[in-house]
Amino acid sequence: MSVETFTPTGLEFTHGAAQKVKNLVNEEGNERLKLRVFVTGGGCSGFQYGFTFDEDVAEDDTIVEREGVSLVVDPMSFQYLAGAEVDYQEGLEGSRFVIKNPNAATTCGCGSSFSI
């Protein structure tokens, strides 16, 4: 009998998102700030993404570092975000952090909620 080890796919933190986080952290003047991404119940598709800045990191958080800044995800949210890409986009609809999530079966028109 063989045992297989499963390693979850990571979370991609793009150059554009890292640069925006870096700019916002510099504006605040607090180098301890990290972008926290989380998933909560709600939205038109069942789950919704949330973003906040946080100084604290829990022992079981996943941390993705890029270009001197950090993205933090709690374990409950990570199970929905494994393999996803966190990006920052500017366009006619405004500018925002966006998540491209291969785990999402459906998403709403604005892209802030999804279902599995």
Swiss-Prot record:
Cofactor binding notes: Binds 1 iron-sulfur cluster per subunit.
A Gene Ontology term for the protein's cellular component: cytosol
Domain of life: Bacteria
Keyword Iron carried by entry: yes
GO molecular function: 2 iron, 2 sulfur cluster binding; 4 iron, 4 sulfur cluster binding; iron ion binding
Subunit record text: Homodimer.
Official protein name in the record: Iron-sulfur cluster insertion protein ErpA
